[in-house]
From Swiss-Prot:
The gene is scnA. This is Lantibiotic streptococcin A-FF22. Maturation of lantibiotics involves the enzymatic conversion of Thr, and Ser into dehydrated AA and the formation of thioether bonds with cysteine. This is followed by membrane translocation and cleavage of the modified precursor. It is found in: Secreted; Cell surface. One of its GO terms (molecular function) is signaling receptor binding. Keywords: Antibiotic, Antimicrobial, Bacteriocin, Lantibiotic, Plasmid, Secreted, Thioether bond. It comes from Streptococcus pyogenes. One of its GO terms (cellular component) is cell surface.
Length: 51
C-alpha cells in the first residue's frame, strides 16, 4: 500500500505539459529523441563501420 502512495505522489508532481509529452499527446504526438532526428542509414553506418 505504501508503494501505491509513492507512485501517486510522483505522478502528482508531473505537470500536465510534461505528461502530454510523455504519453505522446503533445503538439504533434511525437516524443523527440536523438534517433527521431537522424536517418536509419546514419545509424547503420555507425554500427557497422568499425566491425
Amino acid at each position: 500500500m505504501e508503494k501505491n502512495n509513492e507512485v501517486i505522489n510522483s505522478i502528482q508532481e508531473v505537470s500536465l505539459e510534461e505528461l502530454d509529452q510523455i504519453i505522446g499527446a503533445g503538439k504533434n504526438g511525437v516524443f523527440k529523441t536523438i534517433s527521431h532526428e537522424c536517418h536509419l542509414n546514419t545509424w547503420a553506418f555507425l554500427a557497422t563501420c568499425c566491425s
